[in-house]
From Swiss-Prot:
Belongs to the TRAFAC class OBG-HflX-like GTPase superfamily. OBG GTPase family. This is GTPase Obg. It is found in: Cytoplasm. It comes from Orientia tsutsugamushi (strain Boryong). Residues 1-159 form the Obg domain. The gene is obg. GTP binds at residues 166-173, 191-195, 212-215, 279-282, 308-310.
Amino acid sequence: MQFIDEAKIFIKGGNGGDGCVSFRREKFVPNGGPDGGNGGCGGDIIFIGDRHLNTLINFKFKQHFLAQNGRAGAGNNRTGKSGQNLVLKVPVGTQILSNNKEHVIFDLTKDGQEFIIIRGGKGGLGNTYFKSSINQKPRKNTVGEIGDSMWVWLHLKLLSDVGLVGLPNAGKSTFLSAITSAKPKIADYPFTTLTPNLGVVYINNNSFVVADIPGLIAGAHLGQGLGDKFLKHIERCRIIVHLLDITAENLLQNYYTIRDELSSYSLSLKDKTEILCFTKTDTQSNEVIMSKLLELQPVINRVIYPISSYTKYGIKKLLANILSELQKS
C-alpha cells in the first residue's frame, strides 16, 4: 500500500432541516392549532484514531467530506431525522492542522481517540414553537442552520519508541529486518528505503516499536535528499539509535553530519537519548573494529556498540540496552 503522510481535505457538517408549518386537521377538528415539527440537526464530522491504519491513502483521491443533512420537520409535531455523523478514521499519530498549517487543531495519539471537529447545523423551528396566547395560528418557521465547513491538513507522524537514523546505506533496513518481522526493501545502494518502516521488537516479555526512515545527508533539514520529508516520523520516538557504517571513511565526520541534521531540524531530536552502533562489523577484523572504537569513542564521549545484522553479533546486547533505556525514560 502506498505510504501517504500528508493530505489536504475539505470537511463540512450537515445542514439542519427546516422547521415545518402545519396545522392539525382532523375530521372533527377542522380548525386545529399548529403542529409543525422542528427540523433535524445536521451530522457532525468526527475523526477517530485507528491503530490498524498506517497511511493517509484514503484521503489522496477523495478530498471533500460532507456529513448528512438533517431532514425537515413534519406535521403532527414530528421532528425531522437528524443527519448521520461522518466518521473519518485516521492512523494514530495524525495531526489535524489549520488550512495555513500554523495551528494544530488536534493530535490523535491514541487508538480509538475521537475528536468532533465540526458540528452539524441545528434544525429549524416548526410553527408549533411560535404559538402563544396572542398568536394561536402562527405561520412562522425557521430554516435549518448551515453546517460549518473548513479546509484542514492531515499530517501523520508515526508513533514509535525507537527511531533509526544514519547516512544512506548505513544498514538501517537490514538491522530492522534482523530484529523484527518487518520486511523493508534492502539493497546495496543509497536511498533503498523511500518510505518509513515500522517493526516490533519482542524481548524478555517486553516489546517496543522501531521506526526506520530514509537515510539522511548533509542539508536534509533544508530539503536535501529524503530526510526532511521523513524526519517528522521520529520526532515522537523516545530513543534514537544512530547507525554508523564501519566500512565508511571519515566516521567522525559522518557522525557529526547526522547530529547536525537532527539539531537543525528540531531541538527535541537533538536532546533525545542516543545509542550509537557500528554496523557491518562482519566485514572487518577484530583488530580494525577495536582500532576504530578506540579512535572514535574518546572523541564523542559515547559508548559504541559493534553489531552485525548478518551474523547477529552484538544484537542481543544492543537490544537489552535499548530496552533498559526505554524503561528509564
